[in-house]
Amino acid sequence: MILEENKGMFALPGFDLIQYEGFKRFINQGLMEELLKFPKIQDADQEVEFLLVGDQYKLREPSIKEKDAVYKCVTYSSELYVPARLTQKRNRRIREQILFMGSIPLMTSQGTFIINGVTRVLVNQIVRSPGIFYSREPDHKRIPLYTGTIISNWGGRFKLEIDGRMRIWARISKERKFSIITLLLALGLTRKDILNGVCYPNILLDLWKRQDKDIKSSEDAIIELYKNLYCVSGDVTFSESIRKELQRKLFKQRFELGQIGRRNPNNKLNLNVPENESFLLPQDLLAAIDYLIGIKYGIGTLDDIDHLKNRRVRSVANFLQGQLRLALTHLENSIRQTMHKAIKRKRSLTPKGLVISTPLLTTFKEFFGSHPLSQFLDQTNPLAEMIHKRRLSTLGPGGLTRRTASFQVRDIHPSYYGRICPIETSEGINAGLITSLALHARVNDYGYLHSSFYNISDDEEHIVYLSPAEDEYYRIATGNQLASNWGTQEKQVTLARYRQEFLTIAWEQVHFRSLFPLQYFSIGASLIPFLEHNDANRALMGSHMQRQAVPLLKPEKCIVGTGLEGQVALDSGSVTRSTQEGQIVYVDGAKITLSLNDNETIDTELITYKRSNNKTCIKERPIISTGTYLKEGQLLADGTATVGGELAPGRNILVAYMPWEGYNFEDAILISERLISEDIFTSLHIERYEIEVRITNQGIEEITKDIPHLDSYVLRHLDSNGLVVLGSWVETGDVLVGKLTPQEDSLRAPEGKLLQAIFGIQVADTKESCLKVPIGGQGRVIDARWVYKENILINNAKTIHIYILQKRKIRVGDKVAGRHGNKGIVSKILPRQDMPHLQDGTPVDMILSPLGVPSRMNVGQIFECLLGLAGDFMQRHYRITPFDERFEREASRKLVFSELCEASEKTRNPWLFEPDYPGKSRLIDGRTGDTFEQPVTVGKAYMMKLIHQVDDKIHARSSGPYALITQQPLRGRSRRGGQRVGEMEVWALESFGAAYILQEMLTLKSDHIQARYKVLGAIVTGKPIPKPNSVPESFRLLVRELRSLALNLNYFLISEKDLEREMKNV
């Protein structure tokens, strides 16, 4: 239990603390721990000794700023310097030098890492905690077996099993097991030690008598263990190398518990082993056998392996410390080799001559580049960044695999309550394996998840953090009251949680109370208003789609929210705050100048048109004016998708739930052209194109404006250096960078020179390899720059980056969604005069299908749009905490109807609230002017445009690449692929009798090599399209496959003539 200093009221914890605290733990503890563990290195004669003075290490301040690291495509890191001492005992000479060990990537102020200019994040991994866990499992005959699983700190494991005949086995894999007696003897115990160290000696004595082989000594046991482990048959003689191999393979990988794992057997088996003893001892094994036999007799308890007390979080600190340990191991081996070679060749030794920085640099580079939990930061909007940093994954090295993970692992466990969100998880094969931290959850130094509760004892008031093992022993009342009601006991009986069950108990028996209703959910789920009225599946989709919302050109604050929007925007780092108190003296789009009281000024630079990882535009907008006096912490500028310091990924749109000529069938959505003309759903996207300039075998590639092979029109935007001019509007096919590549002259042979002289051929010694605007890439050029990467010496390459800004209005085919999982595709854009309009003449902006509500059970969208309508007319914003039914029944409905009624009275619009059909009003058809037959639900809903846009997905292919083996078109937009015609498509064409189209698709358009070239000529010349006259390539491939199986397949044409069958070989 951890007590907090603050009393009474509470503040929300920082949402990105899990990343910062992990890195802080690595820098303050893990780094020094690993450096101090670095061993003394001596030569074979023990005359030369090398030692690192780990406690005096220094980290140099980075030579580059965070934003410059992204701009210049380099790694944001700090150089590590450690003093080292080299002692030569023969002449008693000691040399000390400060060594450069390498660079360690630093965490940025946003809680991320910048590797080669790319923003990355380390996802926290939740794994089984090391220790021993007892369970009951069925064997292959479905007979229950009691097992004790010992999980090591490395993730390796082995099992102790007791079967129906009271035989105890040690199992390393499904196939291999051996008697526990063999293992105990191999550990160095004698028969007397074993029998004296257990509570059930008779069972072990009986087991000894029933052994197949007579094992008398430790050496015999080691040989038996070695033969079993490596499946060796025949006679094996004992040697020291066998002992070392077993120690390395078995004992080190499966017996090392670590500091965290040591606590588990101490508590479970009532042992007093010191916590710094990280390996499993023989006495631990004897106690574990005793407990296993006790469980067989009904004494002791089984463990729930999915309980959070048996799982821990591996955060940034664990990952980086593990990589540093690996790098120092490589360095140790390198020093030993260098020292051995130098002494052998009688060279002088210095500390700098022994240590190289390569192990540290390559280890971290490989880790951040290839580890599955080092991921591209999702930068679609600030919420996506925040959720990505708080993600928990059970996948990755040392974790589970998505193919073998069981339903029990994926399911919601009662211990998740207040620690892991029960709603937000991945859809599909990763369901339950990728989860998200709850709002008030935090990770302690040992990796266990804690949740906060409010102590309601009479003598003191404070907030406590309970671990998953602790909160089972307390009765905890659910979050059924707000902070303003703390201390009152208006309910004599309350609902409480005790030992993973819900009980109704007297108020005096409650130990703790939940802080507030949203503490059980993640950030994404907590931003959904009226969450309690939605089905959990739709709430999951809603939290996912908020992450996918594209920042808009003109964002707007939501009318109906939950109150967490400001905290998300603040903790994501997307808003800019003043660092000191002062007065604003200068403001423009790129800089804000603050004057302090002592006539000093501070300049705050704003981000303008920066590309995110997801190609969205990051831009900051100043929200204060010159002359404003500010205090420390006040807002200076809004960032991407924020308004007034609150998250704003969408717009408040006037929606109607009604069918309209079938155009909103099956989640299709009708929109008004007002959304286009007024840039309601217009977003900015930045695409980056790059081209390398290399030194080839034929010469250096040249960047130039003079490209003889191309038309001057496509070169019109190039400057004298061959780069595109900033501010140019470029279209598909325009050249962005003019480049000529030297090529080998094919006419240098004697016969080539003769032809050149006869025909007067001018030989082109270069070919154009320009960077051109691809299809759909038109836009405004906002930046063009040379980038000199860190590995420039390796491949002699320099890179040019061109950034193009696109302004995308909403189109047919774009995906839009609300916060309740109500998503759809834009099917038609209507003129505003044709849209249905309200009784005051306001045309509706969007028409949604009413059938999308009852079956999906996301009624929260109806509450939101009706309350939004009232707020729009009364110029109010609402921040509603979910689960307001704790105050009274139907509280949400009463609130919405009371606000609508007040709005109709204040604005003198009686149609806003009509008692006969509350929440609905009569709409007028914009085309005819008639009133619709039924009243329609109309309101202001907060809708978002998602990143799934038709511009990125639409694709057409006239001709393109073919696969080498099947000769069929490739698959996918990125490869300029074709449309797949599968079984169902063939059936559809067959059912309509479209024989010629079907034949074309299966032959001419696909893999009929000769015929497809003839088709192109026939289309150009206007001749009839020829029929295929031979077998397509896929059938030839099938024949070859069958022949490889020694099956010869011939195909014949059978015709009946004069009542005789005649076979012709095709």
UniProtKB/Swiss-Prot annotation:
EC number: 2.7.7.6
Keyword annotations: Chloroplast, DNA-directed RNA polymerase, Nucleotidyltransferase, Plastid, Transcription, Transferase
A Pfam family recorded for this sequence: RNA_pol_Rpb2_7
GO cellular component: chloroplast; DNA-directed RNA polymerase complex; mitochondrion
Coiled-coil segments on the chain, per record: none
Keyword Membrane: no
InterPro entries xref list: DNA-dir_RNA_pol_bsu_ext_1_sf, DNA-dir_RNA_pol_su2, DNA-dir_RNAP_su2_dom, DNA-dir_RNAP_su2_hyb_sf, RNA_pol_bsu_bac, RNA_pol_bsu_CS, RNA_pol_bsu_protrusion, RNA_pol_Rpb2_2
Gene Ontology MF terms: DNA binding; DNA-directed RNA polymerase activity; ribonucleoside binding
GO aspect biological process, one term: DNA-templated transcription
Subcellular location: Plastid, Chloroplast
Main location: plastid
Subunit-structure text: In plastids the minimal PEP RNA polymerase catalytic core is composed of four subunits: alpha, beta, beta', and beta''. When a (nuclear-encoded) sigma factor is associated with the core the holoenzyme is formed, which can initiate transcription.
NCBIfam families according to UniProt: PRK00405.1
Main function: DNA-dependent RNA polymerase catalyzes the transcription of DNA into RNA using the four ribonucleoside triphosphates as substrates.
Protein name: DNA-directed RNA polymerase subunit beta
Origin organism lineage: Eukaryota, Viridiplantae, Streptophyta, Embryophyta, Tracheophyta
Gene: rpoB
